[in-house]
Amino acid sequence: MTVITRFAPSPTGKLHIGNVRVALVNWLYAQKYNGNFILRIDDTDRDRSKVEYHEAIIKDLQWLGINWNSSFLQSTRFNKYAAAKQYLISSGRLYECYETPEMLEIERKRQLASGYPPIYSRKSLELTTAQKVQLQAEGYKVHYRFLIDRNKPIIWNDLIKGEIKYDGSNVSDPIVIKEDGTMIYMLCSVIDDIEYRISHIIRGEDHITNTAIQIQMFEALGAAIPQLGHLSLIKSDSGKISKRIGGFTIDYLKDQLGIEPMAVNNLLALSGTSNNVDAYFSLESLITKFDLSAFSKSTIIYNENELVTLNHKLLVNTEYDTIKHRLTAIGLPDVTKEFWLAVRHNLNTLNDIKIWWQICYLPTLDKFQEQDAEFLKLAAELLPSGKLTDNSWDDWVQNIIKATNRRGKALFMPLRLALTGITYGPELKYLLPLIGGDEVRARLLRYQ
């Protein structure tokens, strides 16, 4: 059997780390078993689906390195859905309903008040043809529900959670075709999964109830049921993650936070598994590590600091030739290999390099302790002449110690503040050659 997985986002908002994790896991599973990965755009919601969100989904997935063997939009397949609709009507699994949302809400409240679960009463099944004609004449619009077999337990062996059971009598018949004739996601998805021979459906555990219903839809359409797996959800410290809450979207991580794509991939592929979350440099490494059985059933708490730490590890170990084109893209085409090697250990994101470029070549230095003025003047006098190298620092420091008897923080901190304006950063021995002898001397003497 060929493994075929899919990712089916709705173009109603931007991708966030929760749904990207689903995409990544499905992609990794397909790659692990030499299968195919399909991108399906669930755009049947005509009011909320936007072209710009569709384009953003494509862009974000490509940025992460997730590619697909084929792609399609559900909005191009209405003829297929219409044929399935007629089949299900003729087989008695779709039936007409005429209740308004207000009527359904009254029924729901009545059931809850009586201590019953809000399960649709199936009153519409009792309507005669004449009654349906009368309702239509009175302006009531038809919608369709899928008839759940309530005498049959729904059971599947989940790839992540193990055996899951649903009592069919506790499942309400879902509306699958709206009053405007639009078929909703739940049934469209099953029709597509059948035609595209999806072998494994892996998605968030918030879809478990949908899965129970869709199992009966597969059976009603005479199709085999794919392997099913449900990932635990990702939550933030403050609660739910969604496309409508800021701070979790891929464009925020990429454009505002400055995160590398592999930092996102590492965190989402390895969090909530028995594997350590480490900084792998390629998706190929993650494919090798990938094991669906390693995924935990517990909720994952997303921590942005953990993502930034992974990002730092990646940058620290990134070679200059690999990053050079990216430096040009962010407006720093003149960064040399020496500069990159000097500052990369102090970068949490690539954009941080702009701070050190500013410090070395476009300084605005205002931090200085007045009592250190004479010390800095002496340090300037002791600075080696000629071009500074990595070795210049050690010679310079030894001469300063001999002349002032200063050591440790009392020696290094005034120099760091005078030369960089901040109390932390790359080793000064590597910054000196970058700043240059004349500029180092000028910075030391500017306080005289």
From Swiss-Prot:
Its EC number is 6.1.1.17. It is found in: Cytoplasm. Disulfide bonds: none annotated. One of its GO terms (biological process) is glutamyl-tRNA aminoacylation. GO terms for molecular function: ATP binding; glutamate-tRNA ligase activity; tRNA binding. A motif ('KMSKS' region) lies at residues 240-244. InterPro entries: aa-tRNA-synth_I_cd-bd, aa-tRNA-synth_I_codon-bd_sub2, aa-tRNA-synth_I_CS, aa_tRNA-synth_I_cd-bd_sf, Glu-tRNA-ligase_bac/mito, Glu/Gln-tRNA-synth, Glu/Gln-tRNA-synth_Ib_cat-dom, GluQ/Sye. Its main location: cytoplasm. A motif ('HIGH' region) lies at residues 9-19. GO terms for cellular component: cytoplasm. ATP binds at residue 243. It catalyses: tRNA(Glu) + L-glutamate + ATP = L-glutamyl-tRNA(Glu) + AMP + diphosphate. Keywords: Aminoacyl-tRNA synthetase, ATP-binding, Cytoplasm, Ligase, Nucleotide-binding, Protein biosynthesis. Pfam families: Anticodon_2 (PF19269), tRNA-synt_1c (PF00749). PROSITE patterns: AA_TRNA_LIGASE_I. The keyword Nucleotide-binding applies. The keyword Nucleotide-binding applies. Monomer. Belongs to the class-I aminoacyl-tRNA synthetase family. Glutamate--tRNA ligase type 1 subfamily. PANTHER family: GLUTAMATE--TRNA LIGASE, GLUTAMATE--TRNA LIGASE, MITOCHONDRIAL-RELATED. Catalyzes the attachment of glutamate to tRNA(Glu) in a two-step reaction: glutamate is first activated by ATP to form Glu-AMP and then transferred to the acceptor end of tRNA(Glu). This is Glutamate--tRNA ligase 1. It comes from Orientia tsutsugamushi (strain Ikeda). The lineage of its organism: Bacteria, Pseudomonadati, Pseudomonadota, Alphaproteobacteria, Rickettsiales.
